[in-house]
Amino acid sequence: MKINMKIFIFLTTFQYLIDIQMYPCNNIKGNLILYIHHLVDIYIYFGGFLFNPLYHLIVVIITLLHWIKNDDKCFLTEWSNSICYPEYTEYKGFNDFSRMLGIQDKYPTISYYYLGFVILYDLNKI
């Protein structure tokens, strides 16, 4: 397995394990959706550095359009929340590294700025 794929799997699994320690999910289907969400999240944030920047650019643009169209909410977050955390009546943001470190709470739009940065990076690498 190539080093980039190992880094990707490590970051995904590490983030997922921290997440389920903070917010346990007691549902097998919910855990599968949550792990897939962590895969997508790590790809969005690091995929351009690890893999093909053109494919990454396409995924990032689709993600941004989805967030904008869906009132800054991710369908994967809503889906996993409905299965793992039905007690939350309001939207519970996805627990990724930036939220775990308190960055999302201090700078709620930081994801948009970071994705703007990775778009510029991807365009430079294409």
Where would I find each of the regions flagged by the language model?
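Juxtamembrane "helix-exit" motif on the non-cytosolic side of transmembrane helices
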Residues: L17-N26, I68-D72, L123-I126
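Hydrophobic alpha-helical membrane-embedded segments
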Residues: F51-T77
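Solvent-exposed, well-ordered amphipathic alpha-helical segments
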Residues: M1-K6, L50-L57, Y121-I126
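Core segments of transmembrane alpha-helices
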Residues: L34-F46, P108-Y121
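Long, highly hydrophobic alpha-helical transmembrane signal-anchor segments
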Residues: C25-I58
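Membrane-proximal soluble regions of multi-pass membrane proteins
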Residues: K69-P108
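Alpha-helical transmembrane segments and their cytosolic membrane-interface
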Residues: M1-Q21, N81, Q104-L115, I126
